[in-house]
Regions:
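CoA-thioester-processing core
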Residues: 1-25
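Amphipathic alpha-helical segments at domain termini/boundaries
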Residues: 19-127, 143-162
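Long amphipathic alpha-helix in the N-terminal Rossmann-like dinucleotide-binding domain
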Residues: 129-140
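Phosphate-binding active sites in nucleotide-utilizing proteins
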Residues: 149, 162-198
Length: 198
């Protein structure tokens, strides 16, 4: 229920472009560094190194030691996306894929702001959005669900080193709604089930 903070929605579009930044920020998907480094116009990486890092890092430092001014993300401008409908399309797609969630839509707002504001103003906007989300009902509910799921997987008083049992078959007594649902869960997991109605 949150957006990336600490300037993430403002810096990433500056170093990777709007389309890539939108995809990463709204989905949270990992992208291999080699793929990002090969993207045209990317400024996230100065250099990727295969093999021994130390000699390559020293050589790189020597190469740029005399360069002034050093490039700064602060000075990079964000080009508006080539597709003028990119932000509207992203919002429409998120309305379908992340139905009812506020944060992904607000991510799009922040990335769009990066194309219109300087870095400081963009970070201020991002901070306001983040603060509005972190105290909101949806973020609180999602945090509650997150911790609830983890708590549900931990049974009190059962030692962590308790060996797992291999379940080979299951019997469910009661073929009502609940029994049918339990039966389907086991069948979907490939475990044979005997369903008994008493």
């Amino acid at each position: 229920g949150l957006i990336p903070g600490a300037g993430g929605t403002q810096r990433l579009p500056r170093v990777l472009g709007v389309e890539t930044a939108l995809q990463m920020i709204t989905t949270g998907a990992s992208v291999p560094s080699e793929k990002l480094a090969a993207a045209p116009g990317q400024k996230l990486f100065d250099k990727l190194v295969d093999g021994d890092l130390l000699p390559a890092a020293i050589a790189f430092a020597k190469d740029i030691a005399g360069a002034r001014p050093l490039p700064s993300v602060r000075d990079l401008k964000v080009a508006a996306p080539a597709d003028v409908e990119a932000f509207a399309k992203a919002r429409a797609e998120l309305a379908k894929s992340r139905k009812g969630l506020i944060a992904p839509q607000r991510c799009v707002d922040c990335v769009e702001a990066a194309t219109k504001l300087d870095l400081d103003a963009g970070i201020k906007f991002e901070r306001e959005v983040f603060e509005g989300l972190v105290t909101g009902d949806q973020a609180r509910a999602l945090r509650h669900a997150f911790f609830g799921e983890r708590a549900a997987s931990k049974i009190p008083d059962v030692p962590a080193d308790t060996p797992l049992r291999d379940i080979k078959s299951v019997a469910v007594i009661g073929a009502g709604t609940m029994g049918g649902g339990i039966t389907m869960c086991f069948l979907n997991a490939g475990i044979p089930v005997k369903l008994l109605e008493m």
